[in-house]
Amino acid sequence: MMTPQRLKSQLVKKDPYLKPFREALQRRMERARLRELQLTDGQCTLSDLANGHLYYGLHKTAEGWVFREKAPNAVALYLYGDFSEWQIRPEFALTSIGDGDWEIRLPEETLKHGMLYKLWMVWHTGADERLPAYVQRVVQDDVTKVFSAQVWEPDAYEWKNPLPPKPRHPIIYEAHVGMSSQEAKISSYHEFQETILPRIKELGYNTIQLMAIQEHPYYGSFGYQVSNFFAPSFRFGTPEELMELIDTAHGMGISVILDVIHSHAVKNEKEGIGAFDGSDYLYTHHGEKGHHRVWDSRCFDYGKSETIHFLLSNLKYWMQKFHFDGFRFDGVTSMCYFDHGLGVDFLSYDQYFNENVDEDAITYLTLANRLVRELRPDVLTIAEDVSGMPGMAFPTEEGGIGFDFRMSMGIADFWIKTLKTRSDDEWNMGELFFKMTDRRAEEETISYVECHDQALVGDKTLIFRMIDKYMYDAMSVFVQNLTVDRGVALHKLIRLVTLTLCSGGYLNFMGNEFGHPEWIDFPREGNGWSYQYARRQWDLADDNTLKYSGLNRFDRDMIHCVKENKLLESAPVALCENDGDKVLAFRRGDCVVVFNFHPEKSFTDYTIFCEPGEYQIVLNSDDPLYHGFGNVDVAMTYRTMPFEGKNRLLLYLPSRTAIVLRKILDITEIC
């Protein structure tokens, strides 16, 4: 008997603002417990339950093949494809076996590896082709652009490397396989493995977040309009090539997490699960409630057992078959609220507990986190939530929803707003420190300057906002340009302060580390179906005559500095927030991090009060290696001196420069 224990929520102890909602939190916790009990009948674990991918769909057996599908609204189902010359034949009709399930068993010789097939679904008012809901391999015809399921039964992939340990502080490289090539084309899993993984390893990232893996009909959706939740995208290669990519990353000590889409489904009916069995309510909400008015997609009904089973099985499938180390859940805000949080300012705790909250979605997310930890206790889960839902990144056994981290989405907004609305001499150091560290004490976050969202067409990356047109003709090391100098300097400082003040982890989108120019624009009718802006120009980072190369080296050394000196192992302590001088300094462990954001002023013998000791510079943004001006003497050591009952460092701080100093010797020089 696997009955979930009844526990009391501990959230109120962590957040006193939740005291008026103590009973609501307890009900939420109890709801998840009872839902798990209902799903498992108290006879098994969530992991035992989440095996839909092993039951439904097409599977090889000792006797031949078995195919099963859930379609309670259907009156007849047929398999058809290469094996039937694409004709609907009675010998390939499925049999109803109860509870809305259908089944057919076929001799081994009927199907061969690589054959294409579909479902013909018949319901009371119509009939149409469908792809199986649990299909694990889908391909698209080059000419007709029609999608079909594919029989996929290759030799089993042999895993070579053990799973890496969970990073305490994920330094995440957000990547899209398809647009990772230098060439104007769709890249592949194999090319990514051969050319991009070594770059990521050299830069020092310990986690890769792979986007657009779940199959999606429209390449330009960036992978966020999913049709086939169990099928890795055919565009990039075979499932085994994806396995090899992940296996190779594991051999480098890098974790790989999936950007999983459980917030909605593409509305396409032939390719996806919209109106799958002729109804619009098998996995999604009925009617308007099931339509996302902004995304134009289908919204899951998390109160349905079929939906919970489908989505939980999906998580187990990706973890067990492909060895993903965790998930970044996209669109969590959209899941948690019936209005999807659209245009809403979350200003009151009442908004987290009113009738707009989809409690079924909260329950699903809680069960999802329980499941993945049953499968692997050191799994990594991240929530993309802009609402600030309490308990999002808090253990389920203590009343939380269970994620390890939530995305700190306000930081990216802060940087955009700052660059758009304030001149450099209007930056506020106290506000900057607060914005970088603003979070609930009980939750950890993933900080980032910009992710893929800021790079899309219609928006601008931060460096493009700062340098604009000069990125095309003034990034040469042989060209002097004040706008470029400012942009290069601030690009380094903004990324360093975001990373060194993060509370849990850090994320960067592929190419932004070196200030990739321009925007992302996937092939579409409006751009002549061009891949010109759906690629990454790695040659810019590799060309030492361009300042992109210095930004790339700075990103590498910044990450290695943070890891080697264990900066993130202790909380930041503010040492200086001088608004007039635009100087910000703080301590993390044995390191002191100092920023001079002033656009013009450099300071000699600037006082920073800190712990007594002898310090050495371990990172200097002004180093010529990073296309700085070399005004800081990194060979010096800095010894604190007593001053007015404290200990102080006297530092030379050039304008728009940051330095990281590490204590190399403890001293007791204190007044």
Regions found by a protein language model. Give the residues of each.
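The feature marks proteins involved in alpha-glucan
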Residues: 2-66, 71, 87-89, 93-174, ...
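Active-site beta-strand termini and strand-to-loop segments that position acidic
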Residues: 61, 440, 586-589, 651-653, ...
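Surface-exposed beta-strand/loop patches in extracellular or lumenal glycoproteins
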Residues: 67-71, 77-81, 598-614
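Conserved, mostly hydrophobic/aromatic
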Residues: 69, 119, 175, 200, ...
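C-terminal beta-strand-rich structural cap/linker in extracellular carbohydrate-active enzymes
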Residues: 113-117, 634-671
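Conserved alpha/beta catalytic core and glycan-binding cleft of carbohydrate-active enzymes
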Residues: 139-145, 323-325, 344-531, 563, ...
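Substrate-binding/active-site clefts of carbohydrate-active enzymes
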Residues: 139-140, 157-167, 172, 176-357, ...
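Aromatic- and carboxylate-lined catalytic core of secreted/periplasmic carbohydrate-active enzymes
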Residues: 369-370, 376-377, 536-575, 660
